[in-house]
Design a protein with these regions (language model features):
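Low-complexity, intrinsically disordered Gly/Pro/Thr-rich segments
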Residues: 209-223
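Exposed beta-sheet edge/beta-hairpin loop segments within beta-rich domains
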Residues: 150-152, 220-225
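Beta-strand-dominated extracellular/periplasmic modules and repeats
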Residues: 37-212, 231, 235-239
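N-terminal secretory signal peptides
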Residues: 1-14, 19-27
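Aromatic- and glycine-enriched pocket-lining scaffold segments that form the walls
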Residues: 228
Length: 239
């Protein structure tokens, strides 16, 4: 069934907490409420930053469909994933859309490989598959077409994201990661091109990064044809 993101989302409510520093940045899942997505904004749920990891590359590659490698046009194979994120600013107890924010996403392919990396384990320098950024629209939304991430030793299945804004004379940056329910990943990774590869060794609860706030970073995902549609809210708050 095709998913329409202009619907109520389901999620969990958490208590708001303040972060130290001149700028407070928060990220959170959408809450169960009657407001339609794109209408009244949900309350923000505070979750921790997470590391950008060793494989962030500031490609400055603006595109919605990140499946291809710009160097040769080839698509990375995998189960389709439509990812929608909404960026909002907490103001007066409401999350108002943030327009013009740069939202980068990057993740590994079905084999657990990142693009544009040259280290002891990966030799993909010069490629840029599964990387890109979008600017938030009038509703604070960005949409990406990608594939469901693969797995590699030591990490739960995840997508990295970075939000950069320039509000007045103050630039802010928030970096974190998105996760998936283990049961969903189990189903997806039974399908090609994931199936037949080394078994997924690290589940969410076995990943130290996930244990540091990852439960509130799990996307809301639903089946969408042959693939999945996933949604997540991120909020920014000024002190």
């Amino acid at each position: 069934m095709k998913m329409n993101f202009v619907e109520p989302w389901r999620g969990r409510r958490a208590a708001m907490r303040k972060l130290a520093g001149s700028v407070v940045l928060v990220a959170g899942r959408a809450l169960a409420q009657r407001d339609a997505f794109g209408g009244a904004a949900p309350a923000c749920v505070l979750t921790p930053r997470q590391t950008e990891g060793p494989y962030f590359v500031d490609e400055r590659l603006q595109r919605a469909d990140i499946r291809s490698d710009p160097s040769n046009g080839t698509l990375r194979s995998g189960v389709p994933l439509a990812l929608v994120m909404r960026i909002a600013a907490l103001s007066g107890g409401r999350c108002e859309p943030v327009t013009g924010a740069i939202v980068d996403v990057w993740h590994c392919d079905a084999a657990g490989v990142y693009s544009d990396v040259d280290d002891a384990s990966l030799r993909t320098k010069g490629t840029a598959f599964l990387r890109g950024y979008q600017l938030t629209d009038a509703h604070g939304q960005v949409r990406f077409t990608t594939i469901y991430p693969g797995a590699y030793r030591g990490r739960a299945v995840h997508i990295h994201f970075k939000v950069r804004t320039n509000r007045g004379d103050r630039a802010t940056e928030f970096t974190s990661q998105l996760y998936f329910d283990d049961r969903l990943t189990d189903r997806v990774h039974e399908r090609p091109p994931y199936a037949g590869r080394a078994s997924r060794r690290t589940r969410n609860g076995d990943d130290a990064l996930f244990r540091a706030g990852g439960r509130s970073l799990i996307v809301d995902a639903r089946q969408d044809g042959e693939g999945y549609a996933a949604a997540y809210d991120v909020g920014l708050r000024g002190a």
